[in-house]
């Protein structure tokens, strides 16, 4: 990011972000100012990202989930995100287009980055999601998905996989597009994330 340390967001990045997200110019500029206050270097570390994410969910423990979100957007694995990657991360976890979102969801669940998802990786992400759900909301969940183990079992069952099978990106996206129930189960309710983003700018 050429002008990451200056006070204004470059026109190119602003236009690209408006094109790829639903955020307004005003929102993006005000977020950029906040971003520079929190991260004067123009880059955000995993710890800083977790800390900002925690502000959105004061009643929950989003650290594990935030860590996985961070990993999935740190394309060059350098341990930092720039403002563009940061905004796209917030957008994808709250609003992104279905296909884009599913590609991202695959990378979120592919914890070891080997291009396939195992049942244990599904459980790891679902456990992180459960830490984001309040105990009251957990009580409202159906009996067959009210623990991380049950929910992971249900997701894996929808794909018709054996315990030691792997799931490719194509299978993951096709299966999820074909079954709205899987889509609901694999994500932390984006509506809630969206509400939080509107309530509290980073």
Curated annotation (Swiss-Prot):
UniProt modified residues of type Cysteine sulfenic acid (-SOH): 39
Gene of this entry: RCVRN
GO molecular function terms attached to this record: calcium ion binding
Entry-linked Pfam families: EF-hand_7, EF-hand_8
GO biological process: one example: phototransduction
Post-translational changes noted in the entry: The N-terminal glycine is linked to one of four different types of acyl groups. The most abundant is myristoleate (14:1), but 14:0, 14:2, and 12:0 acyl residues are also present. The Ca(2+) induced exposure of the myristoyl group, known as the calcium-myristoyl switch, promotes RCVRN binding to the photoreceptor cell membranes only when intracellular Ca(2+) concentration is high.
Cellular location(s): Photoreceptor inner segment; Cell projection, Cilium, Photoreceptor outer segment; Photoreceptor outer segment membrane; Perikaryon
Protein's UniProt name: Recoverin
One CC-aspect GO term: photoreceptor inner segment
Signal peptide per UniProt: none
Residues the UniProt record annotates as site (Interaction with GRK1): 192
Membrane topology of the entry: Lipid-anchor
Main location, first listed in the record: other
Keywords noted in UniProt: Calcium, Cell projection, Disulfide bond, Lipoprotein, Membrane, Metal-binding, Myristate, Oxidation, Redox-active center, Repeat, Sensory transduction, Vision
InterPro entries to which the protein is assigned, alphabetical: EF-hand-dom_pair, EF_Hand_1_Ca_BS, EF_hand_dom, Recoverin
């Amino acid at each position: 990011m050429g002008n990451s340390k200056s006070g204004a967001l470059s026109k190119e990045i602003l236009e690209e972000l408006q094109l790829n997200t639903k955020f307004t110019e005003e929102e993006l500029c005000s977020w950029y100012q906040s971003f520079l206050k929190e991260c004067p270097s123009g880059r955000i570390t995993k710890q800083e990202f977790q800390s900002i994410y925690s502000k959105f969910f004061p009643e929950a423990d989003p650290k594990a989930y935030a860590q996985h979100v961070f990993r999935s957007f740190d394309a060059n694995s350098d341990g930092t995100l720039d403002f563009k990657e940061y905004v796209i991360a917030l957008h994808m976890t709250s609003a992104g287009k279905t296909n884009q979102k599913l590609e991202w969801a695959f990378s979120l669940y592919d914890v070891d980055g080997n291009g396939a998802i195992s049942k244990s990786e599904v459980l790891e992400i679902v456990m992180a999601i459960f830490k984001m759900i309040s105990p009251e909301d957990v009580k409202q969940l159906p009996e067959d998905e009210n623990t991380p183990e049950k929910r992971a079992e249900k997701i894996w069952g929808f794909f018709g996989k054996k315990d030691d099978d792997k799931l490719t990106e194509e299978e993951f996206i096709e299966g999820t597009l074909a079954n709205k129930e899987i889509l609901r189960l694999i994500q932390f309710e984006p509506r809630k994330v969206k509400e939080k983003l509107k309530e509290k700018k980073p």
